[in-house]
């Protein structure tokens, strides 16, 4: 008698594990795609930050500061920053603007760039990155 009770199966619970698998599998796939999208986009943003930072510091080295504190800005700083950016940039980034001169009352170069998100789960979009390279004492091209 006990064995008959233990062996009886309830017909109401038939296919429960299949239904659970059918519901959870697409949700897990979406979750994993979301994580992959975030990771690839984050790596792209970090690479764009590195390229923008390098080009901002290269452009800042073209700024000259006179002994009286006057900042001499030429178009050469913008050109050098753009040249460095375009030489190093990955295919999914683009240069938006370069502005070398006085930034926050200090000699610096501001580079603004954009990178495309991965677009695996969400639609691809542009992520804006800004980098400032300040001129440090003794780091102009003439001092090297």
Which residues make up each language-model segment?
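Short, conserved structural patches
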Residues: 3, 46, 65-144
